[in-house]
């Protein structure tokens, strides 16, 4: 049975594992959205969910890493500038933890350029989208990375 959770924050340990804790390497989530602005993370995850993706949201890099290990998303969309772990630090950590996961960065801050140059100096090149982004443009960009699973599921986790 699929559960639909709309904009409800639930503790990480309460996330249902029926579809996500898999030993065969299959994904529990298609897309994980990470942003310290809850309304942005929740809204993007909801838009993706309504477009057929199994989408979840996290509000910081640490929670995102836990969810990525558990749910093995095909794509993580992360804000670049966040307290604690930046989106670029998250992307680099995901390379070793969940290597099959692709990362798409998005930001509305000019300081992002400095972070991207630092990443490029380390030999990493990331795709970045500007905030705000029209929902149709986000769906189009996500579809370039991953196809929807066509399941109704959505969870926000902090």
Language model features: what each stretch is:
Residues 82:
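Receiver (REC) domain active-site loop signature in two-component systems and cognate sites
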Residues 79, 107:
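Active-site residues of response regulator receiver
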